[in-house]
Amino acid sequence: MYNSVLSGGEGDFVEKKSRFIGGGYFVKSEEEALNKISQIKEIYKDATHNTYAYIIGEDAKIQRYSDDGEPQGTAGIPMLEVLKKEEMRNVLVTGTRYFGGILLGSGGLLRAYTKCARLGLLAAKKVVRENFNRTKFSYDYTYHGKILNYLTINGYKILQEEFTDIASLTLYVKENAPIIKDLKDMTGAKIKIEVKACEELPTIDGKL
């Protein structure tokens, strides 16, 4: 389980005639991050600077940044600090600048690129990524109504339904979630439970 973003997005603002574009992107590897940076540089190839910072891995083992020609320590590092403060993982933030003719100074640049990182995270939508088991529950029809009611009350979304001589439902279930014990109790243990796969999924306030 770790803090990250849903997908990707951008926001922009103007500071003393310079236009800044802040981007945020979900990346699972350094290769993905570098590919995205190349895409950004191609899209904004006429920009004065294309800066970035990223943290890869749940252990935050890979951390990189670039000032891309801005004074040392005024762009990449403040963006990386935003990621660290938010405890973000597998996230790339970018800061693109179109120079407007007025120098911002070190403090002004630091604030502007910090804002780029925050805008990027906001646009990409902050989430918590958690592991879920894709789980199939099979049981006699006599329990179907009770089980559906339980799922509705507890906010579960049904991924797949099968109706043969028995009823089967497939759901995303967190590790050690009470649903396993609850449905066993509800059916007197007359329920078949099969974990099909473990998947990493984005959640907001603990919900898919």
Predicted regions and their residues:
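Short amphipathic alpha-helix segments
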Residues: 138-156, 178, 182
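Short glycine-/aliphatic-rich beta-strand segments at the starts of folded cytosolic domains
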Residues: 126-142
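Active-site beta-strand/loop microenvironment that shapes enzyme catalytic pockets
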Residues: 75-123
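Terminal, non-globular segments
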Residues: 169-178
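Structural motif
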Residues: 23, 52, 90-93, 134
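C-terminal regulatory domains involved in ligand/effector binding and gene-expression control
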Residues: 1-74, 186, 194-208
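N-terminal positively charged helical leader segments and presequences
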Residues: 163-167
